Amino acid sequence: MAGPWIITLLCGLLGATLVQANVYPPAVLNLGPEVIQKHLTQALKDHDATAILQELPLLRAMQDKSGSIPILDSFVHTVLRYIIWMKVTSANILQLDVQPSTYDQELVVRIPLDMVAGLNTPLIKTIVEFQMSTEVQALIRVERSKSGPAHLNLSDCSSNESTLRLSLLHKLSFVVNSLAKNVMNLLVPALPQIVKNHLCPVIQQAFDDMYEDFLRLTTAPIALSPGALEFGLLSPAIQDSNILLNLKAKLLDSQARVTNWFNNSATSLMETTPDRAPFSLTVRQDLVNAIVTTLVPKEELVILLRFVIPDVARQLQMDIKEINAEAANKLGPTQMLKIFTHSTPHIVLNEGSARAAQSVVLEVFPTNTDVRPFFSLGIEASYEAQFFTEDNRLMLNFNNVSIERIKLMISDIKLFDPEVLKDTLTKILEYTLLPNENGKLRTGVPMSMSKALGYEKAMWSVSKGALKLTPASS
């Protein structure tokens, strides 16, 4: 638990950026329309949606549509007498469009279709071809259930006559053109229904698979050293044209035992408003700190100062000589320091920058055989914290030590103002504690989410109360 000194320091670091705090989940995966379009398009390809379009039963659809109207049925049979076969010869799904709905928690997905149909008639030796363009529209909604958690669902899939365009690709004889025109007139009321009946179930399956893929890549365990980090779905949401997956998290030790839960929304300074990035993963500050605590646990360092940093050892001896010359003369070749990390580094995330605060206890021993120190100091220090990406890993590095407060806890040489040691202590922490902690952070945190979403490079940025992962600009 952080002591009163570190709380004071953290309050100071937070004070400069204090804004009205809101309630946010531990993490948020924000998927923009570009990602939704790309992955739904791929899911439609995986389900052979274009092959489904090429199998549309055009002739039967015209017959079924006219069957209930005797006069129209007679006309259809007259037209069909001149058709040997008729089918969709090519089909393409054009670029999907994802837009916000006029209703809350709802997206509109428009799927434009471009098809060419051909018919064979004894009236001419060549195939009569005409182009059919239409659009399928569906809604993505957040569905809430009394018996289970909320989930995303695709519904109201349909195709409307108003989006249908048919045109003859090649003008032929008057008789053939008239036949083709009659066929197209019959297709206008029939085509939207067969597209709905045959393609909409495929779109539903493709959406369900896409949603499962999003959940799978989000909840895949992330290896830490030691242990692991796992995300889980709290709830989905829709904001503007974006899908938001509000995430819970848990940290596990090397034995896969849960050491920390983050399964509730909490007051935070973080901002999660969708931006123009194709996607973003926003991680709340307290979860960032829990990850850092896992990577950099509390520990004790023992340092033979003259062997490790002799220049600093001489400087410390000179400082002690100013306090007590007799004590300084007792410092031997095995002069020893012990550093106890009273707290793990606590990260404070501000807009565009981050700092870490940490409390340590430092003890100075004249030799490595002494059991009682010359003196013990409580030190409150802060560092610059730099987050960056390296090979799809979240990396963190500390540098530029700043000592905020020093307290003399025990002294066997005499009472003195510990501020006289500030420069030397800063160098000691710079040369010993920081390299040790940076070494533990060197493995980083693997984050393959960006690559799984189709972006080779990503970058981490710091905002108020949160870390954010977004694709790197090309």
Swiss-Prot record:
Compartment(s): Secreted
Miscellaneous: Asymmetric expression in the embryonic node is dependent on Invs and Dnahc11.
Protein name (Swiss-Prot/TrEMBL): BPI fold-containing family B member 1
Signal peptide residues on this chain, from the entry's feature table: 1-21
Single GO MF annotation: lipid binding
Gene expressing this chain: Bpifb1
Key word Glycoprotein present: yes
Function: May play a role in innate immunity in mouth, nose and lungs. Binds bacterial lipopolysaccharide (LPS) and modulates the cellular responses to LPS. May be involved in formation of the left-right axis in the node of the developing embryo.
Domain of life: Eukaryota
Tissue: Expressed in tongue, lung, thymus, and stomach. Expressed in epithelia of palate, anterior pharynx, trachea and upper bronchi. Expressed in distal tip of papillae in the anterior third of the tongue and in serous cells of von Ebner glands in the posterior third of the tongue. Expressed in columnar epithelium of the duodenum in embryonic gut at 16.5 dpc.
